[in-house]
A protein has these predicted regions:
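Short beta-to-alpha loop/turn elements within the nucleotide-binding domains of ABC transporters
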Residues: 56, 67-68, 74, 78, ...
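Short helix N-cap motif at coil->helix boundaries in the Bergerat
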Residues: 72, 89
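Flexible, glycine/small-residue-enriched loop-and-beta-strand segment within the central core
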Residues: 1-56, 83-84, 91-92
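Short coil-to-helix segment of the ABC ATPase nucleotide-binding domain corresponding to the Q-loop/switch region
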Residues: 59-60
Length: 92
């Protein structure tokens, strides 16, 4: 779910499902083993090229730096960046 006043940069990927690499070898095909909701709350920003994984909430006013890989929730008015994304500051 994407709420109001959200800014999403170019080439952002929201991944709602994934699989373990072992599943490909075992079954010879991709079997979805992880799926979940992604929520982007009001007024948050997601920078260009970021990847958001399943079961993540980007809380209100949060900022995700370009190219970040978000593996867990981003607290309100927090700035995250990196692979995996980690807190680097707060929105003032």
């Amino acid at each position: 779910m994407i709420e109001d006043d959200v800014v999403i940069g170019p080439n952002v990927t929201l991944i709602g499902a994934s699989h373990k690499k072992e599943d490909i070898a075992k079954y010879g095909k991709v079997v979805t083993t992880t799926k979940g909701k992604i929520t982007v709350k009001k007024g948050s920003w997601i920078g260009a090229g970021s990847i958001i994984l399943p079961n993540v909430t980007i809380h209100e006013g949060a900022v995700v730096g370009a190219g970040a890989v978000v593996t867990k929730d981003v607290e309100p008015y927090t700035i995250v960046a990196g692979v995996p994304a980690r807190k680097i500051g707060v929105v003032k």
